[in-house]
């Protein structure tokens, strides 16, 4: 039994499968007699107090502001590694996925805004379809195994990473609330300490965790979204130590399984529970639901593919050897899997009063529809365009 579990966890698609499973459990709980237990569990208050400092939040907020900050540490580590030695480490490597990612942020936001042009109460959700869920998208890609060209995997990974950078900028600029000067000063001091540790090539991960915890608490109290602390921590961990150690890689390997198999499934379970009670066709076709769903399915596909295509045709970028535009189109569809990142942005966009709670449900429904169709359609398109030549020849006879 243990051996079977180990084999499953080693699969490229394991994290995506686990995310989907926990999301389905959330939908099951939210639409059965267990729904009161589910929602009461998420609203259960949890508090931490150290001297005069205290944080009092419902469990759902601890998941979204606390555990997700750990996930953003991993994002920061991955982005830094890829920028320094990986898929986006120089202009030639970065420009093609960067342009695709730019289209994948601009066009979905435009699609959402156009659909919600006459619904001002929904317009603050414009950023929801901008994000790509790295774990889910790579999980679907992993289902096809070695038949997917390595260059295509790198393109998707680099694009999703740049996409996340864009989401981080959006969170920092548009989703910060009233700012606390004292907390910001505390956060600035913590950042300064992290930078000094980086310059001194401190390799003790526990030191970054302690200072990072202070930074997270300060950012949380400051009014800036706490997950940004995670990104800063990730960027401050050095790639190399004084004696050749690799603290960044070590920290990344330490966090990756926890994020993939604990934090993200927990986030999915906490946020994917959409009650369908009282929903009708008018709910399904509400501007908010349709804006999010079509932003992910249509906006992402058109944005990523059209910008990538034009970049090559205009001579700005080059297609990597071994991949073609059919495969780029299929991957563009996969980029419409927003799921966890889109759920996260929905919580930030509509995180206020009771009406906003109803808006979150509509947005989540759109995310589930758009991400689900993108995953299935993207998988079959990619399967078709990576099919061995012998199969294609047989089909053409």
Curated annotation (Swiss-Prot):
UniProt main location, coarse: membrane
UniProt keyword Transport, yes or no: yes
Topology relative to the membrane: Multi-pass membrane protein
Alphabetical keyword list: Antiport, Cell inner membrane, Cell membrane, Ion transport, Membrane, Sodium, Sodium transport, Transmembrane, Transmembrane helix, Transport
Gene Ontology MF terms: sodium:proton antiporter activity
The keyword Transmembrane is assigned to this record: yes
Recorded catalytic activity of this chain's protein: Na(+)(in) + 2 H(+)(out) = Na(+)(out) + 2 H(+)(in)
Localization per record: Cell inner membrane
Chain ranges passing through the membrane: 14-34, 36-56, 59-79, 95-115, 125-145, 154-174, 177-197, 204-224, 254-274, 292-312, 328-348, 365-385
GO terms under biological process: regulation of pH
Gene3D superfamilies linked: Na+/H+ antiporter like domain
Gene Ontology cellular-component terms listed: plasma membrane
NCBIfam families for this protein: NhaA, PRK09560.1, PRK09561.1
Main function: Na(+)/H(+) antiporter that extrudes sodium in exchange for external protons.
Similarity-based family: Belongs to the NhaA Na(+)/H(+) (TC 2.A.33) antiporter family.
Listed name of the protein: Na(+)/H(+) antiporter NhaA
Organism listed in the record: Glaesserella parasuis serovar 5 (strain SH0165)
């Amino acid at each position: 039994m243990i051996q079977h579990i180990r084999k499953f966890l080693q699969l490229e698609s394991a994290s995506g499968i686990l995310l989907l499973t926990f999301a389905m459990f959330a939908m099951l709980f939210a639409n059965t007699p267990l729904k009161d237990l589910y929602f009461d569990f998420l609203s259960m208050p949890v508090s931490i107090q150290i001297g005069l400092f205290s944080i009092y939040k419902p469990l759902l907020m601890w998941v979204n502001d606390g555990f997700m900050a750990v996930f953003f540490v991993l994002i920061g580590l991955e982005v830094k590694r890829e920028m320094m030695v990986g898929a986006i480490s120089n202009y030639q490597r970065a420009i093609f996925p960067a342009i695709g990612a730019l289209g994948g942020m601009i066009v979905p936001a435009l699609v959402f805004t156009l659909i919600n042009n006459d619904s001002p109460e929904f317009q603050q959700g414009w950023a929801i379809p901008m994000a790509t869920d790295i774990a889910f998208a790579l999980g679907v890609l992993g289902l096809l195994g070695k038949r997917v060209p390595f260059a295509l995997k790198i393109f998707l990974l680099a694009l999703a990473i740049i996409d996340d950078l864009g989401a981080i900028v959006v969170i920092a600029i548009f989703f910060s609330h009233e700012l606390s000067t004292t907390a910001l000063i505390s956060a600035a001091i913590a950042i300064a300490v992290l930078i000094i540790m980086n310059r001194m090539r401190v390799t003790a991960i526990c030191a970054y965790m302690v200072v990072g915890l202070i930074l997270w608490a300060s950012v949380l109290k400051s009014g800036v979204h706490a997950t940004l602390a995670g990104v800063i921590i990730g960027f401050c961990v050095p790639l190399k130590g004084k004696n050749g150690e690799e603290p960044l890689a070590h920290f990344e390997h330490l966090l990756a399984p926890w994020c993939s198999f604990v934090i993200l499934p927990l986030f999915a379970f906490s946020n994917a529970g959409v009650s369908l009670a009282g929903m009708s066709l008018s709910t399904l076709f509400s501007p908010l639901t349709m804006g999010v769903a079509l932003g992910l399915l249509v906006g992402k596909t058109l944005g990523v593919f059209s910008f990538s295509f034009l970049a090559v045709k205009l001579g700005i970028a080059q297609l990597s050897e071994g991949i073609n535009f059919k495969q780029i189109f299929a991957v563009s569809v996969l980029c419409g899997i927003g799921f966890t990142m889109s759920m996260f942005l929905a919580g930030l966009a509509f995180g206020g009063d009771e009406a906003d709670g109803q808006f979150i449900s509509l947005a989540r429904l759109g995310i589930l529809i758009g991400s689900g169709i993108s995953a299935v359609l993207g998988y079959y398109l990619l399967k078709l365009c990576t099919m061995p030549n012998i199969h294609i020849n047989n089909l053409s006879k």
